[in-house]
Amino acid sequence: MKITTRYIVGIVILVVGLFTILLIRPSRFVWTPTFAHEDKNPFGCFVFDSVMVQTMPRGYKATGATLRETVADSSSNNVLIVARDGKLTDANITDIKRLLKRGSTVMLVGVDIYEDSNADKAFGLQCITYANFFYNEIKNKLAHNSDDLYDTLHYRAVYKDAHGTKRHRLPRCIAYPDADYRIYKTLLAGVVNIDSAAAVHRRYYILSQCVSPYYDDEYKPDNDYKAVMVEYGRGRLVVVTTPLLFTNFGILSPSTQPYVMRLMNTLADKPVVRLDASMKDGAVIGADADKHNASPLSYILSQPPLRWAYYTIIAGALVFIIFTARRRQRVIPVIP
């Protein structure tokens, strides 16, 4: 066998061996939240959606429809929106109101509502969420048996009125016994506040709050609410600050799965539709949601880098056509 042939055979064996190792070795998890239907990583929703399809009694599906498209659908559905730092526009608020007046329940998970915003004025709620997971930090604390790793989430559905918090007639969907859940602190960041003036006119139900000592008393909120439900029209709006629990990780973890199922039960009286931005490579709420209804060309022209790339391709094609035409239009010499 020639030396060249040996080298070729050796390279082929090496390449095949490397590919085999890459295929059979376990893949590393990606801990970045996507909430995507097809994502099987911890903070995707492949398993979450699969479990909900089997457990929601009236039906469940994930869809790439925007909130506006969902409102236009005449079907009577409850809506679940799980986002990362989601923002509501005035159009989104109008659409949510229409769903609530229709009798639907809308659950907003990971959607920020700032003080004095139009959403705050509409529903009497402020909400700050947080969706980052520091894997290495948690891994180090677990290795050292750190006490500063967990927090206690307390489920105790109570009615909030203008005079304070008290027991009240609870809707069946939230009337569970009190329960405590010991959960990683980083999964429980965020807080919901109730406008005391709005509580005079509406019924608010506090579903859960953290009860452990706060990591920094200087910044500790008065009420560390994590999930709040408000009655609006014929429907209910549920605001949740913990989007990382509505994922594969949250539904598979024994410490969080019962809590997630309690919250999901608020949607169980009708078919549930989860709006998933990843299914259309865009957004289902916020200013970017209009991109779903735009043509591919309009989206390209709306993005400066894509727009200049498009113009460059067009200009290059024109130059190529011109020079090609000039080269082919040669003068044919006349042979005497």
Model-derived segments and spans:
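Long alpha-helical segments found as membrane-embedded helices
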Residues: 1-60, 70-78, 83-102, 106, ...
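Membrane-embedded segments
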Residues: 60-156
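Alpha-helix initiation/capping motif
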Residues: 66, 114, 242, 275-276, ...
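A glycine-centered loop/beta-turn motif at secondary-structure junctions
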Residues: 182-292
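Mixed-charge, polar/low-complexity N-terminal
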Residues: 4, 10-22, 28, 80-81, ...
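An acidic, glycine-rich "communication" segment
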Residues: 112-214
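Flexible, active-site-adjacent loop/turn segments at secondary-structure boundaries
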Residues: 33-35, 123, 243-244, 249
